[in-house]
Amino acid sequence: MNSPAQASTKRNARVYRLQPAAPAPATVAASPSGVALVCTEGDRLTSAKAPWARPAPQPLHPTEFPIPSAGKSVIKVGLDIDLQHLTATIQWDHLQPKPARDFKTPADLVAWVKEQRSAGHVVYTVYESCGFGYCLHYDLKEAGAISLVITPTLLDRSRRRKNDRLDSAQLCLRLARYVDGHRQELHVIRVPKVSEQQRRETGRQRAFWRGLILAMANHGRALRLEHEGRTLSGHWWGPRVWKRIEPELTPFVRAFLEPLREQILAAKAQVDQLTVEIEARVAREKIPKGLGPLTLALADAEVCDWFRFADRKAPASYTGCCPSERSTGGVQRTGRIDRHGNAHLRTLLVEAVWRLARWNPTWHAYRKLAGQLNAAGKLPKRWAVALARQLAVDLWRVRTGRSTWAELGFLEMT
C-alpha cells in the first residue's frame, strides 16, 4: 500500500514525463516575407534571411513520452545491427529484460514492431549510427515505433568482452533509463531527411573521386621513379604536360601510364560534373571572396539544416574545434581540440579560414586576432582552428537570418 506522499510523487513523475521542456526565452520578429524568425538572447536579429528560413529548430528528443492505454505496455528494444542479422534485447515495462533474440532481416523486425503497435503497445527502439545508413530508422518510424539513433559509444568500460548480445543488452538498459527521464544516457543524433542525405552525399562523392585521382597520380609517379629513376610533375596526366613527357617515357612505363591516365581523366570529368552541380545551389547568392560557392554549398549540405541549432554554441561544438578539457576543483586544463563533430565540415572551415585571411581581412573575427600574427606576419595554426570555429557561428547567423555578410565584416564579395 503506497503512502499519500509516494502516490503524489508517482503522479508528479508521470506529469513530468508528459510535459515538454520549457523553451528558452526568445524574441520573435516577422521577416519581410512574413515568416517569423526566432532569435535567442545574445544574438542580434536583422531583416536579412536565408531563402529557406523557418521559425524553430527540429528537436532531437521526443517532446513527450506517450503512455499506453490500460493493460498495454511500454516496450524498449536495444538493437545491434549486423550484415547477417539484427540482435535485439527487449524489455517490457520495468521487468527484467529478456534474453537477446535475433531477427534475420530488418523486415522481420519491422513486422514485429507493427504487430506490437497494432496490439496497442508503445515501442521504443535504439541503435548506434553505423555504415548501414538510416533505412532501418525510416522503416521503424513508419511502423509506429519511436526510433532513436545514437552516436557510436563504448557501452561497457569495465569488461574486456564485447559481442552483439552484450551490446544490445546495454543499449536496452540505457534506453530504459532514457525513457525514465535520464537524457544523458543516450547521445541522440539528428537523422537527416532523405533529400538532405542525398544532397550531402553529392559532396562526399566528389571528395571520393578527388581521392581516387590523387591515389592514381601518385601511383604513376611511383611507377616511373622505380623503373626510370625520375618522377612526374604535378598534373602529369593533363594534356599539355602529357604531350611533353610522353616521348621521354620508356615503352614499359608508357604501357602502364596510358591506361592509368585514362582512368584519371574519367575521374576528373566526374569531379567537374559534381562541382558544377554543387555550385549551382548557391549560384544566385553574393558570397564573400575567399569563402567561395563550392565551400558554402558543401557546408550547407553537411549541416543539412542550419535551423537545427538553437544557439551559437551548438554550431561551434558541431565542428569539433572546441578544446578538450581535463579540469578539477580550481584547476582548469585545456588541450587539443576534441574532434567531436563533423570532420568534413571541420576541414572545409579550416581551409576557408586561410583563404579569408588573405581575401577578406576585414572579417570581424580576423581583426580581433590581427595582433597575434607571428614574426613572419602569418596566422598561427592554433588561431586558424579558433577562427574556423567562429566561422561556423557566423555562417549559422547568416543562414538563419540573424545577421548579414556586411555586418560581420565581409566586404569583398563575388
Regions found by a protein language model. Give the residues of each.
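Glycine-rich, often acidic, oxyanion-interacting loops/wings at catalytic, nucleic-acid
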Residues: 201-286
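Low-complexity, acidic/Ser/Thr- and charged residue-rich accessory regions of DNA metabolism proteins
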Residues: 330, 370-414
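Phosphate-backbone recognition surface of nucleic-acid-processing proteins
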Residues: 286-289, 293-294, 298-376, 380
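Intrinsically disordered, low-complexity and often Lys/Arg-enriched segments
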Residues: 1-75, 99, 107, 411-414
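A short, charged helix-loop
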Residues: 173-201, 239-251
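Gly/Thr-rich phosphate-binding beta-strand-loop-beta motif of the actin/hexokinase/Hsp70
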Residues: 68-92, 171
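Short alpha-helix plus adjacent loop in nuclease-associated cores
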Residues: 148-188, 331-340
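Nucleic-acid-processing active sites and adjacent nucleic-acid-binding tracks
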Residues: 93-123
